[in-house]
Each structure stands twice: as structure tokens, then as C-alpha cells.
Amino acid sequence: MVVGLLGGSFDPPHAGHVHISLEALKRFRLDRVWWLVSPGNPLKPRPPAPLPARLAEARRLMRHPRVVVTDIEARLGTRFTAETLAALRARYPGVRFVWLMGADNLAQFHRWDRWQGIMRTVPVGVLARPGAGLRSRTSPAARIYARARVGAADLAAARPPAWCFLNLPMVDLSSTAIRATGRWR
């Protein structure tokens, strides 16, 4: 079983999250995608909407038999991705995990706690986001791990460090823009 992990605040979840999840299932040859709705992001200056509201909206929006919306990070008590990955790998030893992120996150991945450990632990699938292509492909992480880049169809079986940048048709939505309209919270 190969599970893609899409971590995020999902504040709010939107059609762009759905789109990249379905593309990741198909192009990275994943069996499942788990939306890890985070209790909070240590790199963001303001707290997100309450977790129950974000979970409920994510479950309403993402209705696919191979995508699971979960609050497992809150239940595990993990705060950083590296901790979450360690806990999930211990809890599910037979599952192969692939970390999924938008290109905007790759651009600042080097700021994450133990980011190089994440790269050495699981394959990483990076999905294009509007306006983030060049910044992500020239980021410190992309430069340091340039030789570890693999094709989309090979990512799930690749031995870490391995990563793939997936160009795909993009949905021009962002949680930040949705919040700015006042349609959320």
C-alpha cells in the first residue's frame, strides 16, 4: 500500500486541494491520499480556523473512495512533519508513504524543521501551484537534491531521497485568497 500524505491547514479546503489529490493518485501511482488536516502550522503567524470546522468542510468537499480526510496529527500530538512521519511509519509499518506538497511549499521547504530528514525518509511529490514554479525549482531544496529528482511514475517506488516536480493544469485558488474575501470563518 502506497499512501500520499497531503498535509496542510486546509483553512479552508478548496477545489485546488481536490485537484492535486486526484492528480497525485493517478500520476504518482498512489493507492490512497490522506489529507492531514493540521491543528496548526508552526510557520504561519496566525492560527487557523477551529480544527472541527476545517475537518467538516474538508470531508464535505473531498468525496473520493481513495482519499481520506484525517485529524491524525492532532490525535498523535505531533507538531512538525518529521514527527508526524516518524509516528505514522511506526504505526503503519507495512505502508509506504509519499509526502505531497504544493510548489509554494518547496520554495520554503528549507525552513521546515528537519527538512533534510524528511527528504531522506520518504519520497516527495511536488505539485505545481500558480506563481510558484520558478521559486520552487530554484529553491535550496531543489538545488541540494537535484540528482534525486525522478519521474512521476517512478516516485512511489523510489528510494529516498527522491522527489518529483509535477507540472499539471492548475486551479487558481488559494486558502489565503478565499479568507480575504470573507467567505470563510
From Swiss-Prot:
Pathway: Cofactor biosynthesis; NAD(+) biosynthesis; deamido-NAD(+) from nicotinate D-ribonucleotide: step 1/1
Known EC number: 2.7.7.18
Catalytic reactions of this protein: nicotinate beta-D-ribonucleotide + ATP + H(+) = deamido-NAD(+) + diphosphate
One of the GO BP terms on file: NAD biosynthetic process
A molecular function GO annotation: ATP binding
Pfam family name, one: CTP_transf_like
Signal sequence region: none
Enzyme class, first EC level, given as a word: transferase
Sequence intervals crossing the membrane: none
Family recorded in the similarity comment: Belongs to the NadD family.
UniProt cross-references to PANTHER family, sorted A to Z: NICOTINATE-NUCLEOTIDE ADENYLYLTRANSFERASE-RELATED (PTHR39321), PHOSPHOPANTETHEINE ADENYLYLTRANSFERASE (PTHR39321:SF3)
Its biological purpose: Catalyzes the reversible adenylation of nicotinate mononucleotide (NaMN) to nicotinic acid adenine dinucleotide (NaAD).
Protein name: Probable nicotinate-nucleotide adenylyltransferase
